[in-house]
């Protein structure tokens, strides 16, 4: 998968498989279970203490459109007070994602109003919180994905994609069902952010473009003159030759190498 951190050494999970006439049960080493009902097909996930965490809606567990390749699954909500958080940067007023229809498809949306979706990030991962207990769900799919978090029906939530596989991971949160454990397990699967260099933690001056070169130098000099800490200055798109990437507008920036060298000597990236 594109999303996994393959640099980690992983142990083969210790999974016990049991079966009855009606279902197949997969149990991990900590006691969490995936219970697969054979007919009609449905899946439910149980915590280490036996509590149902995620459960298919038996009327609509999985949908696959052979003509378009679209896939989706629908889960029952424990109640309307089960609250959802996550999905990365979104243009909603509320932290809660309850009642939202969320699309993951990176989009460069300029000057977007509140409620616009999709925008810049696609993170198909969320937390669910109910009675102080948490679980997490990550949908491992690179196609355009969507999450209906109770918008269509408050009794259920649905997620799917325009194609690909219905490949998702449920994080139980351990015996304590804690958000910390959910995040640890998600990060162990997908990777952790490397420790950034010291300069990246400093003040970074950014806006929609500083140009020409004289203006950039003026900004840098102003920070130093006024003793305002700053480590980075962003140029944005107006340094380019007619907005073509990997080019410089030689009228606005006649000697970019010299400018960058001088800024570096003055402590700017």
What are the functions of these language-model segments?
Residues 203-206, 243-245:
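A short, structure-level motif marking secondary-structure boundaries and short turns
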Residues 197-201, 228-231, 266-269:
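Short, well-ordered coil/turn segments that N-cap beta-strands
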